[in-house]
Structures are given as C-alpha cells and as structure tokens.
UniProtKB/Swiss-Prot annotation:
It comes from the Bacteria. Pfam families: DUF494. It comes from Vibrio parahaemolyticus serotype O3:K6 (strain RIMD 2210633). HAMAP family: Smg (MF_00598). This is Protein Smg homolog. InterPro entries: Smg (IPR007456). PANTHER family: PROTEIN SMG.
Length: 159
C-alpha cells in the first residue's frame, strides 16, 4: 500500500508538474479521499521526507570518498531478502550504463530498505529509482533514460 501511495504522489504531483507546494494536511485529505489508509499515508510521507533528507546530507560525499569506481557492491542478507537477483542485476545494469552512480545507487538501496512492505519486485524498484533520480539535482539525463526504460516497458514496446 505504501508503494501505491508513493506512485500516486509521484504521478500526481511530481511527474505531472502539478503545484508542488501542497500543505501536508491537504495532501493527507486528498490521499484519504483517494482511498488510502491514514497509517500508510503517514509512512509514505515520512519516506519522502527521508528521501529529501538524503539529498541534503553529506552521505553522498562520504560514499564517494569511500568507494572506488571499480568496487563491487556486496549486499547484506536483509538487502538480498528485499532485492532479489533480478533487482540486484538491474541495479548493476543501471550503474554500467551510467544511469546510477555509486551515490544514487546507495540512495536507492536506502529508500528500498525504508519501505515497509512484504512484497517488492522489479517494477517497484524502477519507481524508487525514478523518484530518487528526480530528487537529486544534476541527474536529469539519467532520470530521462530511466523514465524511458520504465514507460516503454509499461507500454509493451521494449523487446
């Protein structure tokens, strides 16, 4: 349910270029009218706040200082539970084609692990990646490419 709220918000406000300065109370009321549960709405809004905080933190500079570009990401057991082999392979693919950097990959993994959901699949990961790339300045080209990957697949054109 939390993933549904995030996708709804992303498509309604961010992707559609709608007015972004919406009061939290108004937003909560709209989400309640759309049929979402209060506890899920709260969790989704906290998740978005944490995404915004990641962008403003020194995490990315600390990550890039510690990781060589040729290093391989070793996933924890908990991360491997959430991110199956297909998801991890997709993250690696996006790094190899320069859609994700080391920093944005770590932000994506952080936000994936921040989700409170028992089910998580590749399509969910693609949406999380899109949200992270949209939120981090300087990633416009990567965002556009990821958006094409997501929407082309949804329309059934990608072979």
């Amino acid at each position: 349910m939390m993933m549904d709220i995030l996708m709804y918000l992303f498509e309604t406000y961010i992707h559609s270029d709608a007015e972004l300065q919406v009061e939290q109370d108004e937003l909560e009321e709209e989400l309640l009218r759309a049929g979402f549960q209060q506890k899920d709405i709260y969790k989704a809004l906290v998740w978005l706040e944490e995404l915004a905080a990641l962008q403003q933190s020194d995490t990315s500079s600390a990550i890039s200082a510690c990781i060589a570009s040729s290093s391989t990401r070793i996933y924890t057991a908990k991360e491997m539970q959430r991110l199956d082999l297909e998801c991890r392979g997709f993250l690696l693919f996006l790094e190899q084609i320069n859609v994700l950097t080391t920093e944005t990959r770590e932000m994506v993994i952080d936000r994936v692990m921040g989700l409170e959901t028992s089910e998580f699949e590749l399509e969910d990961l693609k949406w999380i990646i899109l949200m992270v790339l949209f939120n981090v300045p300087g990633n416009e080209n990567a965002y556009t490419l990821m958006e094409e990957l997501l929407y082309t697949k949804e329309q059934g054109i990608l072979h």
